[in-house]
């Protein structure tokens, strides 16, 4: 069992990496933005432009001295605050239409190869105009300097505070300035075999939609405690942490969290013959509990 933390590991361990932040490289990015072709044609995602623009905006804000430090955010995270939210009643939208409320959540840092700021992107989504949900382990990255959020429309904000968190649930709710964006709708527990869609940012493939079914619910160990989790068959990888899992009516029923690789053999600590990859999510019931719903 592992989260993807953006660290280098052996090839045989790839699928059991931590599902947190995918590190942006040191090369410069050309300017650009998400381009919509209009009409019924889909928006065309420019991955290089997204990470480049987010990095430039984060750099500007870091150099201005405005952002809350990651040290302060982690201090808030460790206190595991709770918040009581009264979410407005709303209907879900098709997963592809909900992308306006899906965010890139990225740790901002300086690497050892240059003096520039970089962004290591993971996933998240709006549950209120000023609140973003992601995983606890996405925030718990002390090697980062601060945390930035980019919306689908290109706006970039620095995280102001952690308003709710649970290591056991692997969830964090972050406050950003009000966005004016309609948040996602939360659903109820999806039954086993239910169809689901996931939108996330695996390894900087931004706004990737994958589909599958709820495979099972099970008990797993997290923060030295037993907690229920949901497995799905929709694919995801590093950078997908915090991505919303939608049911067929466009309501969020889970949050992507981790992968677990099943190997047939293990010898001298080396795993071989990968057989299956399990994809684990946080059930929406735990998010509802965290925000007092």
Segments the model singles out, each with a brief description of its role:
Residues 4-15:
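Bacterial N-terminal signal peptides that target proteins for export
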């Amino acid at each position: 069992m592992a989260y993807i933390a953006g660290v280098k590991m052996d090839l045989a361990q790839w699928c059991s990496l931590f599902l947190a932040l995918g590190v942006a490289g040191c090369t410069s990015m050309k300017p650009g933005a998400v381009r919509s072709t209009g009409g019924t044609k889909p928006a065309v995602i420019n991955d290089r432009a997204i990470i480049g623009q987010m990095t430039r905006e984060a750099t500007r804000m870091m150099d201005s001295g405005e952002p809350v430090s990651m040290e302060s955010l982690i201090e808030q995270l460790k206190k595991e605050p709770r918040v009581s939210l009264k979410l407005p009643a709303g209907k879900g939208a098709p997963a592809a239409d909900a992308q306006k409320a899906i965010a890139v959540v990225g740790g901002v840092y300086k690497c050892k190869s240059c003096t520039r700021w970089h962004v290591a992107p993971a996933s998240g989504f709006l549950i209120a105009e000023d609140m973003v949900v992601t995983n606890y382990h996405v925030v718990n990255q002390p090697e980062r300097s601060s945390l930035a959020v980019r919306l689908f429309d290109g706006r970039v904000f620095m995280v102001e505070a952690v308003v709710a968190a649970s290591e056991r649930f692997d969830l964090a709710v972050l406050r950003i300035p009000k966005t004016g964006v309609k948040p996602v709708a939360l659903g109820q527990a999806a039954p086993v075999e239910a169809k689901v869609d996931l939108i996330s940012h695996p390894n900087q493939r931004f706004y990737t939609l994958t589909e599958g079914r709820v495979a099972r619910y099970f008990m797993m160990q997290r923060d030295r405690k037993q907690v229920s989790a949901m497995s799905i068959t929709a694919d995801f990888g590093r950078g997908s942490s915090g991505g919303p899992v939608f049911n067929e009516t466009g309501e969020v029923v889970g949050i992507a969290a981790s992968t677990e690789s099943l190997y047939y053999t293990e010898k001298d600590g080396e795993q071989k013959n990968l057989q299956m990859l399990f994809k684990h999510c946080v059930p929406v019931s735990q998010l509802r509990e965290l925000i007092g719903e």
